[in-house]
């Protein structure tokens, strides 16, 4: 137990295996609670709050010194579940609750690269994340002499046209307002982004495709016959992909899998990625096809990468597939704690300053924004 009551940011990660909790300044979580006994994909709020309370009382011997709780959700949950969990924690602990969109930044932290597609293969879900290169958008706004709002309006127009072609719901004005606020916070965020090696202008359509993953995401549940899925994917019923990926690509993830799941590398994932590439402009397709980064247990199997690369090459996409540099279970927790430290410009003698020093970022969407009646982005 710590002798002094330190002002602290507590990081809590919830994934499909357990709850991890620790101080943001620590390199690894202090506690782990196994979720297997609960036999469910979602954790009751009462369990999470109880664990946080016990940890804080045991570590700090008090609850009053907690400044913020950063909640890392490395699991597929609905927007309603996220809001209920944040509200429940806030009502119990009475401290700001910050939600962490772990996938995009975790990918950046684990690969230290740009222009890559992250495929996060989990036991219960598969995520596709396109890494953002913010320098390109900032350069675009400068060289075109257009305001950020104008650029966003044009991107929104492209989004409307794209949705119209696919007979999808048009982007509402209020959703665009959220997107605009999100983009502004992106541009002033302290989250580091690798500098681009070659700055170039993007057309409006290219700008949309380049940054379309910050627009609303479609949370799609893919139900297929278990006999069509490999044993490694018996629980993989949920896929989270951007709404602009064709539905055919979503379904393709579970097509052609044999009983052992060995065809995932040879058929399923190549099918999805090809569906993604087909809807990208050629220039953007070239950029995004440079690198595929895989996280998860399945890609760690011997020969998996070679089989995947051979299949993609035979289909005309000579890409490079690599594992994430950080493959530990605590990748999301480490990413959250690292970013918390970088975004906390704190003075230990000024608790009030620390309380207001977290920079706005789409990667850190606080419960106080919910509390103030602000709408969360649809993709959140």
UniProtKB/Swiss-Prot annotation:
Chief place where the protein resides: cytoplasm
User: Matching InterPro entries, A to Z?
Assistant: Actin, ATPase_NBD
Name of the protein this chain belongs to: Actin-like protein arp10
The entry assigns this protein to a family as follows:
Belongs to the actin family. ARP10 subfamily.
Q: Which Pfam families match?
A: Actin
Native species of this protein?
Schizosaccharomyces pombe (strain 972 / ATCC 24843)
Query: GO annotations under biological process?
Result: dynein-driven meiotic oscillatory nuclear movement; microtubule-based movement
Which keywords does UniProt give here? Answer: Cytoplasm, Cytoskeleton, Nucleus
What taxonomic classification does the UniProt entry list for its organism?
Eukaryota, Fungi, Dikarya, Ascomycota, Taphrinomycotina
Q: Name one GO cellular component term.
A: dynactin complex
Top-level taxon: Eukaryota
Q: Where in the cell is it found?
A: Cytoplasm, Cytoskeleton; Nucleus
């Amino acid at each position: 137990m710590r002798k002094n009551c330190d002002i602290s940011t507590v990081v809590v990660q919830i994934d499909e295996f357990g709850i991890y909790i620790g101080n943001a300044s620590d390199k690894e979580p202090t506690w782990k609670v196994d979720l297997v006994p609960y036999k469910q994909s979602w954790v009751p709020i009462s369990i999470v709050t109880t664990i946080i309370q016990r940890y804080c009382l045991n570590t700090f011997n008090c609850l009053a010194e907690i400044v913020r709780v950063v909640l890392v959700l490395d699991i597929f949950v609905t927007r309603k579940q996220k809001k209920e969990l944040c509200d429940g924690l806030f009502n119990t602990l009475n401290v700001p609750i910050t939600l962490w969109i772990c996938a995009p930044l975790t990918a950046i932290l684990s690969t230290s690269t740009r222009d890559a597609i992250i495929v996060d293969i989990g036991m219960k879900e598969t995520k596709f994340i396109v890494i953002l290169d913010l320098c390109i958008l900032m350069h675009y706004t400068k060289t075109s002499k257009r305001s950020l709002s104008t650029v966003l309006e044009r991107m929104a127009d492209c989004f409307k046209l794209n949705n119209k072609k696919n007979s999808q719901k048009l982007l509402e004005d209020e959703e665009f307002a959220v997107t605009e606020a999100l983009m502004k916070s992106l541009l002033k965020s302290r989250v580091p982004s690798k500098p681009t090696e070659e700055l170039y202008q993007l057309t409006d359509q290219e700008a949309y495709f380049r940054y379309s993953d910050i627009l609303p995401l479609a949370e799609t549940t893919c139900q297929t016959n278990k006999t069509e899925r490999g044993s490694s994917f018996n629980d993989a019923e949920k896929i989270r992909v951007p709404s602009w990926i064709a539905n055919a690509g979503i379904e393709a993830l579970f097509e052609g899998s044999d009983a052992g799941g060995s065809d995932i590398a040879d058929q399923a994932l190549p099918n999805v990625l090809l569906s993604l590439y087909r809807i990208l402009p050629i220039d953007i397709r070239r950029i995004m096809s440079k690198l595929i980064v895989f996280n998860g247990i399945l890609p760690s199997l011997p020969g998996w990468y070679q089989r995947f690369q051979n299949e993609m090459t035979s289909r005309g996409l000579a890409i490079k597939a690599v594992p994430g540099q950080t493959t530990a279970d605590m990748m999301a927790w480490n990413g959250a704690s690292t970013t918390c430290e970088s975004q906390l410009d704190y003075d230990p003698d000024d608790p009030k300053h620390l309380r207001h020093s977290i920079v706005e970022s789409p990667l850190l969407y606080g419960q106080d924004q919910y509390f103030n009646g602000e709408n969360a982005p649809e993709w959140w």
